[in-house]
Protein backbone atom coordinates (compact mmCIF):
# COMPACT_ATOMS: atom_id res chain seq x y z
CA UNK A 1 0.00 0.00 0.00
CA UNK A 2 1.36 3.49 -0.86
CA UNK A 3 2.56 5.75 1.94
CA UNK A 4 -0.83 7.52 1.86
CA UNK A 5 -4.07 6.07 0.55
CA UNK A 6 -7.51 7.65 0.88
CA UNK A 7 -10.91 6.02 0.50
CA UNK A 8 -13.67 8.61 0.34
CA UNK A 9 -17.30 7.63 -0.14
CA UNK A 10 -20.22 9.99 -0.55
CA UNK A 11 -23.57 8.38 0.21
CA UNK A 12 -25.29 9.96 -2.80
CA UNK A 13 -22.64 9.14 -5.39
CA UNK A 14 -20.70 6.09 -4.13
CA UNK A 15 -23.47 3.45 -3.92
CA UNK A 16 -23.18 1.37 -7.09
CA UNK A 17 -25.86 -0.71 -8.79
CA UNK A 18 -23.07 -2.99 -10.02
CA UNK A 19 -21.18 -5.60 -8.01
CA UNK A 20 -18.15 -4.02 -6.34
CA UNK A 21 -15.46 -6.52 -5.29
CA UNK A 22 -13.78 -6.14 -1.93
CA UNK A 23 -10.05 -5.56 -1.73
CA UNK A 24 -8.17 -8.79 -0.92
CA UNK A 25 -7.71 -9.96 2.64
CA UNK A 26 -4.16 -9.24 3.83
CA UNK A 27 -2.78 -12.19 5.86
CA UNK A 28 -1.31 -11.28 9.23
CA UNK A 29 -2.78 -7.78 9.11
CA UNK A 30 -5.59 -6.12 11.02
CA UNK A 31 -7.18 -5.23 7.65
CA UNK A 32 -8.31 -1.95 9.17
CA UNK A 33 -8.25 0.02 5.91
CA UNK A 34 -11.45 0.07 3.84
CA UNK A 35 -12.25 -2.98 1.71
CA UNK A 36 -14.54 -1.01 -0.62
CA UNK A 37 -12.20 1.82 -1.54
CA UNK A 38 -13.90 3.82 -4.31
CA UNK A 39 -17.51 2.60 -4.22
CA UNK A 40 -19.73 0.05 -2.52
CA UNK A 41 -22.56 -1.96 -4.04
CA UNK A 42 -26.17 -1.80 -2.90
CA UNK A 43 -25.66 -5.16 -1.17
CA UNK A 44 -22.09 -4.76 0.10
CA UNK A 45 -21.32 -4.06 3.75
CA UNK A 46 -18.32 -3.45 5.94
CA UNK A 47 -18.09 -2.74 9.63
CA UNK A 48 -15.61 -1.33 12.11
CA UNK A 49 -16.87 -2.58 15.49
CA UNK A 50 -15.66 -1.61 18.98
CA UNK A 51 -16.91 -2.72 22.39
CA UNK A 52 -16.07 -2.84 26.07
CA UNK A 53 -17.69 -4.16 29.26
CA UNK A 54 -16.77 -3.62 32.92
CA UNK A 55 -16.30 -6.76 35.00
CA UNK A 56 -17.02 -4.73 38.15
CA UNK A 57 -20.38 -3.11 37.42
CA UNK A 58 -21.46 -4.61 34.05
CA UNK A 59 -21.64 -1.24 32.34
CA UNK A 60 -20.80 -1.53 28.65
CA UNK A 61 -20.52 0.26 25.33
CA UNK A 62 -20.84 -0.97 21.74
CA UNK A 63 -20.00 1.04 18.62
CA UNK A 64 -20.70 -0.05 15.03
CA UNK A 65 -19.32 2.16 12.24
CA UNK A 66 -20.74 1.03 8.90
CA UNK A 67 -20.39 1.44 5.19
CA UNK A 68 -23.46 0.10 3.39
CA UNK A 69 -26.65 1.22 1.67
CA UNK A 70 -28.63 0.35 4.78
CA UNK A 71 -29.18 4.01 5.72
CA UNK A 72 -30.71 4.87 2.34
CA UNK A 73 -33.89 6.46 3.70
CA UNK A 74 -31.80 8.54 6.11
CA UNK A 75 -29.25 9.66 3.52
CA UNK A 76 -26.10 8.47 5.21
CA UNK A 77 -23.75 5.74 6.36
CA UNK A 78 -24.78 4.39 9.75
CA UNK A 79 -23.02 4.66 13.10
CA UNK A 80 -24.71 2.71 15.90
CA UNK A 81 -23.99 3.53 19.54
CA UNK A 82 -25.26 1.49 22.49
CA UNK A 83 -24.48 2.13 26.16
CA UNK A 84 -25.66 0.51 29.39
CA UNK A 85 -25.09 1.92 32.88
CA UNK A 86 -24.45 -0.05 36.10
CA UNK A 87 -28.12 0.27 37.07
CA UNK A 88 -29.17 -1.37 33.79
CA UNK A 89 -30.68 1.59 31.95
CA UNK A 90 -29.60 1.95 28.33
CA UNK A 91 -29.03 4.50 25.58
CA UNK A 92 -29.09 3.86 21.81
CA UNK A 93 -28.79 6.02 18.73
CA UNK A 94 -28.44 5.31 15.03
CA UNK A 95 -26.59 8.23 13.45
CA UNK A 96 -26.25 8.89 9.71
CA UNK A 97 -23.40 10.62 7.91
CA UNK A 98 -23.28 11.40 4.16
CA UNK A 99 -19.47 11.39 4.02
CA UNK A 100 -17.10 8.57 5.00
CA UNK A 101 -13.33 8.87 4.66
CA UNK A 102 -10.74 6.26 5.63
CA UNK A 103 -7.07 7.21 5.32
CA UNK A 104 -3.94 5.09 5.58
CA UNK A 105 -0.72 7.03 6.06
CA UNK A 106 2.44 5.02 6.72
CA UNK A 107 0.24 2.25 8.10
CA UNK A 108 -1.64 4.50 10.54
CA UNK A 109 -5.39 4.31 9.82
CA UNK A 110 -7.93 7.03 10.48
CA UNK A 111 -11.65 7.03 9.75
CA UNK A 112 -14.04 9.98 9.65
CA UNK A 113 -17.83 9.79 9.28
CA UNK A 114 -19.05 13.37 8.85
CA UNK A 115 -22.08 15.55 8.20
CA UNK A 116 -20.74 18.94 7.17
CA UNK A 117 -24.21 20.47 7.30
CA UNK A 118 -24.84 19.69 10.96
CA UNK A 119 -21.22 19.66 12.06
CA UNK A 120 -21.55 16.14 13.43
CA UNK A 121 -18.69 13.68 13.16
CA UNK A 122 -17.47 10.35 14.50
CA UNK A 123 -13.84 9.35 13.98
CA UNK A 124 -11.40 6.60 14.83
CA UNK A 125 -7.62 6.31 14.76
CA UNK A 126 -5.67 3.03 14.81
CA UNK A 127 -1.89 2.83 15.14
CA UNK A 128 0.12 0.87 12.61
CA UNK A 129 0.61 -2.10 14.95
CA UNK A 130 -3.05 -1.94 16.09
CA UNK A 131 -1.90 -1.52 19.68
CA UNK A 132 -3.84 1.71 20.32
CA UNK A 133 -7.22 2.88 19.07
CA UNK A 134 -9.04 6.11 19.86
CA UNK A 135 -12.59 7.04 18.90
CA UNK A 136 -13.91 10.59 19.08
CA UNK A 137 -17.60 11.54 19.03
CA UNK A 138 -18.78 15.09 18.31
CA UNK A 139 -22.44 15.19 17.30
CA UNK A 140 -24.09 18.34 18.68
CA UNK A 141 -27.02 17.63 20.96
CA UNK A 142 -26.48 13.86 20.82
CA UNK A 143 -23.05 12.57 21.83
CA UNK A 144 -19.69 14.01 22.76
CA UNK A 145 -16.65 12.18 24.13
CA UNK A 146 -13.94 9.60 23.55
CA UNK A 147 -13.24 5.88 23.74
CA UNK A 148 -9.77 4.32 24.05
CA UNK A 149 -8.74 0.71 23.43
CA UNK A 150 -5.26 -0.62 24.22
CA UNK A 151 -4.25 -4.10 23.08
CA UNK A 152 -3.44 -6.55 25.86
CA UNK A 153 -0.07 -8.37 25.66
CA UNK A 154 0.10 -11.78 24.01
CA UNK A 155 -0.88 -13.42 20.72
CA UNK A 156 -2.89 -11.36 18.24
CA UNK A 157 -4.52 -14.25 16.36
CA UNK A 158 -4.14 -12.30 13.12
CA UNK A 159 -2.39 -15.19 11.39
CA UNK A 160 -5.49 -17.42 11.65
CA UNK A 161 -8.23 -18.08 9.08
CA UNK A 162 -10.66 -15.09 8.86
CA UNK A 163 -13.39 -16.79 6.83
CA UNK A 164 -16.84 -16.88 8.39
CA UNK A 165 -18.30 -19.28 5.85
CA UNK A 166 -18.06 -18.66 2.11
CA UNK A 167 -19.53 -15.16 2.08
CA UNK A 168 -18.10 -13.17 4.99
CA UNK A 169 -14.76 -12.32 6.57
CA UNK A 170 -14.11 -11.31 10.15
CA UNK A 171 -10.76 -10.05 11.41
CA UNK A 172 -10.09 -8.93 14.96
CA UNK A 173 -7.37 -6.26 14.79
CA UNK A 174 -7.73 -5.92 18.54
CA UNK A 175 -9.28 -9.12 19.85
CA UNK A 176 -8.31 -8.45 23.48
CA UNK A 177 -8.07 -4.92 24.81
CA UNK A 178 -8.42 -2.79 27.90
CA UNK A 179 -11.09 -0.17 27.27
CA UNK A 180 -11.90 3.26 28.66
CA UNK A 181 -14.69 5.58 27.58
CA UNK A 182 -16.14 8.87 28.73
CA UNK A 183 -19.10 10.31 26.87
CA UNK A 184 -21.92 12.78 27.30
CA UNK A 185 -25.12 11.25 25.90
CA UNK A 186 -28.31 13.20 25.22
CA UNK A 187 -31.81 11.78 24.78
CA UNK A 188 -32.78 14.71 22.57
CA UNK A 189 -35.88 15.69 24.55
CA UNK A 190 -34.41 18.83 26.12
CA UNK A 191 -33.41 16.85 29.19
CA UNK A 192 -29.91 17.15 30.59
CA UNK A 193 -27.30 14.92 29.00
CA UNK A 194 -26.06 11.89 30.92
CA UNK A 195 -22.42 11.16 31.63
CA UNK A 196 -21.25 7.66 30.75
CA UNK A 197 -17.88 6.43 32.05
CA UNK A 198 -16.40 3.00 31.35
CA UNK A 199 -13.18 1.73 32.94
CA UNK A 200 -10.66 1.09 34.33
CA UNK A 201 -11.67 -2.57 34.78
CA UNK A 202 -13.24 -2.91 31.32
CA UNK A 203 -12.17 -5.29 28.57
CA UNK A 204 -13.28 -5.45 24.96
CA UNK A 205 -11.88 -5.20 21.47
CA UNK A 206 -12.23 -4.25 17.83
CA UNK A 207 -13.54 -6.32 14.91
CA UNK A 208 -13.56 -5.84 11.14
CA UNK A 209 -16.27 -7.57 9.08
CA UNK A 210 -17.07 -7.34 5.39
CA UNK A 211 -19.31 -9.12 2.88
CA UNK A 212 -20.53 -8.65 -0.69
CA UNK A 213 -24.09 -9.66 0.20
CA UNK A 214 -26.89 -8.43 2.41
CA UNK A 215 -27.19 -10.37 5.66
CA UNK A 216 -30.38 -12.26 4.64
CA UNK A 217 -28.28 -13.78 1.85
CA UNK A 218 -25.47 -14.63 4.25
CA UNK A 219 -27.28 -16.06 7.28
CA UNK A 220 -30.52 -16.99 8.99
CA UNK A 221 -29.18 -16.73 12.54
CA UNK A 222 -26.04 -15.68 14.42
CA UNK A 223 -24.50 -15.43 17.88
CA UNK A 224 -21.62 -13.18 18.88
CA UNK A 225 -19.67 -13.21 22.15
CA UNK A 226 -16.58 -11.49 23.48
CA UNK A 227 -15.77 -12.25 27.13
CA UNK A 228 -12.94 -12.25 29.65
CA UNK A 229 -13.23 -15.17 32.09
CA UNK A 230 -10.39 -15.31 34.61
CA UNK A 231 -7.25 -16.07 32.56
CA UNK A 232 -9.36 -16.88 29.48
CA UNK A 233 -10.42 -14.51 26.72
CA UNK A 234 -12.87 -15.71 24.10
CA UNK A 235 -14.23 -14.29 20.87
CA UNK A 236 -17.01 -16.14 19.05
CA UNK A 237 -19.02 -15.45 15.93
CA UNK A 238 -21.23 -18.37 14.88
CA UNK A 239 -23.86 -18.22 12.16
CA UNK A 240 -26.15 -20.47 10.17
CA UNK A 241 -26.16 -19.83 6.43
CA UNK A 242 -29.25 -18.85 4.46
CA UNK A 243 -31.96 -21.50 3.96
CA UNK A 244 -31.10 -22.11 0.29
CA UNK A 245 -27.70 -23.50 1.26
CA UNK A 246 -29.11 -25.64 4.04
CA UNK A 247 -28.61 -23.41 7.10
CA UNK A 248 -25.06 -24.70 7.50
CA UNK A 249 -23.15 -23.64 10.63
CA UNK A 250 -19.97 -21.57 10.34
CA UNK A 251 -17.76 -20.01 12.98
CA UNK A 252 -14.74 -17.85 13.61
CA UNK A 253 -14.00 -18.48 17.30
CA UNK A 254 -10.84 -17.96 19.31
CA UNK A 255 -9.83 -18.88 22.88
CA UNK A 256 -6.82 -17.47 24.71
CA UNK A 257 -5.34 -18.27 28.10
CA UNK A 258 -2.97 -15.75 29.68
CA UNK A 259 -2.62 -14.10 26.27
CA UNK A 260 -1.68 -17.31 24.43
CA UNK A 261 -3.95 -18.50 21.61
CA UNK A 262 -4.93 -22.06 22.55
CA UNK A 263 -7.86 -22.82 20.22
CA UNK A 264 -8.67 -21.28 16.82
CA UNK A 265 -11.96 -22.81 15.67
CA UNK A 266 -13.39 -22.41 12.18
CA UNK A 267 -15.35 -25.66 12.41
CA UNK A 268 -18.67 -26.15 14.22
CA UNK A 269 -19.45 -29.56 15.73
CA UNK A 270 -22.42 -31.07 17.52
CA UNK A 271 -21.92 -33.26 20.59
CA UNK A 272 -22.51 -36.33 18.42
CA UNK A 273 -19.86 -35.50 15.82
CA UNK A 274 -16.33 -36.84 16.23
CA UNK A 275 -14.30 -34.90 13.66
CA UNK A 276 -11.24 -33.80 15.61
CA UNK A 277 -9.06 -33.02 12.59
CA UNK A 278 -9.09 -29.31 13.43
CA UNK A 279 -9.89 -26.96 16.29
CA UNK A 280 -13.67 -26.84 16.73
CA UNK A 281 -16.53 -25.10 18.51
CA UNK A 282 -19.61 -26.69 20.04
CA UNK A 283 -22.30 -24.12 20.84
CA UNK A 284 -25.73 -25.04 22.18
CA UNK A 285 -28.63 -23.01 23.54
CA UNK A 286 -30.00 -23.40 27.05
CA UNK A 287 -33.70 -23.19 27.90
CA UNK A 288 -35.53 -23.03 31.25
CA UNK A 289 -39.28 -22.53 31.14
CA UNK A 290 -39.69 -23.15 34.87
CA UNK A 291 -37.91 -20.09 36.23
CA UNK A 292 -39.18 -16.52 36.29
CA UNK A 293 -35.79 -15.06 37.13
CA UNK A 294 -34.11 -15.74 33.79
CA UNK A 295 -33.42 -13.16 31.08
CA UNK A 296 -34.41 -13.88 27.47
CA UNK A 297 -34.87 -11.93 24.28
CA UNK A 298 -38.30 -10.51 23.44
CA UNK A 299 -38.69 -12.52 20.25
CA UNK A 300 -39.32 -16.12 19.16
CA UNK A 301 -36.13 -17.59 20.57
CA UNK A 302 -36.45 -17.67 24.36
CA UNK A 303 -33.09 -19.22 25.24
CA UNK A 304 -31.60 -18.19 28.59
CA UNK A 305 -27.98 -18.58 27.50
CA UNK A 306 -25.53 -20.95 25.88
CA UNK A 307 -23.05 -23.72 26.55
CA UNK A 308 -19.75 -22.99 24.80
CA UNK A 309 -17.18 -25.73 24.28
CA UNK A 310 -13.84 -25.26 22.56
CA UNK A 311 -12.22 -28.49 21.33
CA UNK A 312 -8.54 -28.60 20.34
CA UNK A 313 -7.70 -30.73 17.32
CA UNK A 314 -6.55 -34.32 17.81
CA UNK A 315 -8.28 -37.36 19.28
CA UNK A 316 -6.95 -36.45 22.72
CA UNK A 317 -7.64 -32.77 22.24
CA UNK A 318 -8.05 -30.51 25.22
CA UNK A 319 -11.57 -29.21 25.92
CA UNK A 320 -12.71 -26.03 27.60
CA UNK A 321 -16.37 -25.59 28.58
CA UNK A 322 -18.20 -22.43 29.63
CA UNK A 323 -21.77 -21.69 30.65
CA UNK A 324 -23.19 -18.39 29.43
CA UNK A 325 -26.16 -16.73 31.16
CA UNK A 326 -28.01 -13.68 29.89
CA UNK A 327 -27.81 -11.08 32.69
CA UNK A 328 -29.12 -7.86 31.14
CA UNK A 329 -30.69 -6.73 27.88
CA UNK A 330 -28.24 -4.39 26.15
CA UNK A 331 -30.20 -3.75 22.94
CA UNK A 332 -33.32 -5.15 21.30
CA UNK A 333 -34.98 -4.50 17.94
CA UNK A 334 -37.11 -6.58 15.55
CA UNK A 335 -35.99 -8.14 12.27
CA UNK A 336 -39.50 -9.20 11.17
CA UNK A 337 -43.15 -8.27 11.53
CA UNK A 338 -44.44 -8.52 15.12
CA UNK A 339 -46.13 -11.65 16.41
CA UNK A 340 -45.40 -14.85 18.34
CA UNK A 341 -43.07 -16.04 15.56
CA UNK A 342 -41.38 -12.68 15.22
CA UNK A 343 -37.59 -12.53 15.06
CA UNK A 344 -35.15 -9.96 16.35
CA UNK A 345 -31.67 -8.83 17.27
CA UNK A 346 -30.89 -8.81 21.00
CA UNK A 347 -27.73 -7.80 22.81
CA UNK A 348 -26.93 -9.07 26.29
CA UNK A 349 -24.51 -8.51 29.11
CA UNK A 350 -23.43 -12.11 29.66
CA UNK A 351 -22.07 -13.81 32.75
CA UNK A 352 -19.70 -16.64 31.88
CA UNK A 353 -18.32 -19.41 34.08
CA UNK A 354 -16.04 -22.32 33.23
CA UNK A 355 -12.64 -23.34 31.95
CA UNK A 356 -10.79 -26.63 31.52
CA UNK A 357 -11.68 -29.80 33.45
CA UNK A 358 -12.85 -28.75 36.93
CA UNK A 359 -12.04 -25.05 36.54
CA UNK A 360 -14.80 -22.55 37.36
CA UNK A 361 -13.51 -19.10 36.49
CA UNK A 362 -16.10 -16.31 36.34
CA UNK A 363 -16.28 -13.37 33.98
CA UNK A 364 -18.49 -11.10 31.89
CA UNK A 365 -18.90 -10.34 28.23
CA UNK A 366 -21.09 -8.83 25.55
CA UNK A 367 -23.26 -11.21 23.54
CA UNK A 368 -25.49 -10.58 20.56
CA UNK A 369 -27.97 -12.96 18.95
CA UNK A 370 -29.84 -12.28 15.73
CA UNK A 371 -32.50 -14.25 13.86
CA UNK A 372 -33.60 -13.22 10.39
CA UNK A 373 -35.95 -16.11 9.57
From Swiss-Prot:
Gene Ontology MF: a single term: isomerase activity
Catalysed reactions, semicolon-separated: (5S)-3-[(2E,6R,8E,10E,12E)-2,6-dimethyltetradeca-2,8,10,12-tetraenoyl]-5-(hydroxymethyl)pyrrolidine-2,4-dione = trichosetin
Keywords assigned by UniProt, alphabetized: Isomerase
Major enzyme class: isomerase
EC numbers: 5.5.1.-
Highest taxon above the source species: Eukaryota
Reported induction: Expression is positively regulated by the trichosetin cluster-specific transcription activator TF22.
Pathway in which this enzyme or protein is active: Mycotoxin biosynthesis
InterPro entries the record matches: DA_C
Phenotype on disruption: Results in the production of reduced, though significant, amounts of trichosetin.
Transmembrane segments: none
Family the entry assigns: Belongs to the Diels-Alderase family.
Function: Hybrid PKS-NRPS synthetase; part of the gene cluster that mediates the biosynthesis of trichosetin, a trans-fused decalin-containing tetramic acid with antimicrobial activity. The PKS module of PKS-NRPS1 together with the enoylreductase (ER) catalyze the formation of the polyketide unit which is then conjugated to L-serine by the condensation domain of the PKS-NRPS1 NRPS module. Activity of the Dieckmann cyclase domain (RED) results in release of the Dieckmann product intermediate.
Name of the protein: Diels-Alderase
Gene that this sequence comes from: DA
Amino acid sequence: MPAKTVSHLNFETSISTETVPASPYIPGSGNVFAKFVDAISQTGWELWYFDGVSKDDQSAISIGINRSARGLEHGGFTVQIFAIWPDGHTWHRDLYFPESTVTSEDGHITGLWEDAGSGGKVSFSVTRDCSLTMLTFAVPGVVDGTMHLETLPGDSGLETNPELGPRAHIVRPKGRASVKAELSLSSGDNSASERFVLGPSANGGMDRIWTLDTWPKVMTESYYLRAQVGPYAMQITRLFSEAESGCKPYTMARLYRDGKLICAANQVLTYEEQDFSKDSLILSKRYDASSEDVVTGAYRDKNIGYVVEFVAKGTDGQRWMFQVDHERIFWSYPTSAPGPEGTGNTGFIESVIGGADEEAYFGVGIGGQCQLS
